């Protein structure tokens, strides 16, 4: 992930260390031990490799972020693979700038998901794609509690997160189209933050 204080620097979450081969094609990673998904399942190199393979196999629009490195449905299981509980390697088709590869691995399409959980929700060979549209299988500091299209997204603290725990236990994003309604929610204390308020609303709130 990006360092908020210094966006040009990447900060590892799942990875403990990594190295690039002399020919610039093989990226080897060692994972942090003891990681868990929000479900409580252990996060292993198998999950990481499978998540990246899954993105290529599904071949949805964002997959080009990974397939630009020569991965295809035919070769991805050989080019991206785990070599133990905490080790995996990624082999590209030719040398690329490590910064490019690492930045692409921070993209949403390269997000690591819980293989065991996602496959238990698979329908019709979709690798859990339909289920993940409205559910969560990650390992970040917050987890999805509820999602209703054009209505609400509710997140809550993931107590299985390896790093510093979130200082807030829950965050709720509500889809409120009218600026006047947003202003009313702020005034009543039903919302802490609003966006797209009109100048009139802002002036009223400032009084």
Q: Where do the protein language model's features map onto the residues?
A:
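Surface-exposed binding/hinge segments that line
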Residues: 19, 30, 49, 64-121
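N-terminal lobe/hinge region of extracytoplasmic solute-binding protein
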Residues: 1-22, 53, 60, 134-141
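Sec-exported extracytoplasmic/periplasmic mature domains
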Residues: 1-4, 36, 53-60, 95, ...
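Gly/Pro-rich hinge or "lid" segments in bacterial periplasmic/extracellular proteins
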Residues: 4-5, 106-166, 170, 180
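Short, well-ordered beta-strand elements
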Residues: 16, 26-28, 48-52, 87-90, ...
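Ligand-site clamp/hinge motif
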Residues: 130, 158-204
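Extracytoplasmic/secreted proteins, especially bacterial periplasmic and envelope-associated proteins
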Residues: 9, 13, 30, 43, ...
């Amino acid at each position: 992930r990006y360092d908020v204080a210094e966006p040009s620097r990447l900060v590892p979450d799942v990875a403990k260390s990594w190295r690039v081969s002399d020919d610039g094609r093989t990226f080897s990673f060692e994972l942090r031990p003891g990681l868990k998904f929000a479900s409580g399942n252990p996060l292993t190199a198998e999950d990481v490799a499978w998540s990246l393979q899954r993105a290529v196999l599904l071949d949805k629009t964002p997959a080009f972020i990974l397939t630009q490195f020569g991965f295809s449905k035919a070769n991805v299981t050989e080019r991206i693979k785990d070599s133990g509980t905490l080790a995996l390697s990624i082999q590209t088709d030719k040398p690329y700038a490590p910064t490019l590869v690492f930045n692409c691995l921070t993209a949403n399409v390269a997000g690591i998901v819980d293989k065991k959980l996602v496959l238990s929700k698979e329908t019709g060979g979709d690798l859990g794609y339909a289920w993940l549209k409205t559910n969560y299988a990650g390992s970040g500091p917050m987890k999805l509690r509820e999602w209703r299209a054009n209505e609400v997204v509710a997140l809550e603290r993931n107590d299985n997160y390896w790093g510093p725990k979130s200082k807030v236990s829950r965050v709720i994003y509500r889809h409120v189209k009218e600026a006047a309604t947003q202003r009313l929610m702020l005034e009543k204390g039903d919302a802490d933050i609003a966006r797209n308020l009109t100048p009139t609303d802002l002036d009223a709130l400032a009084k």
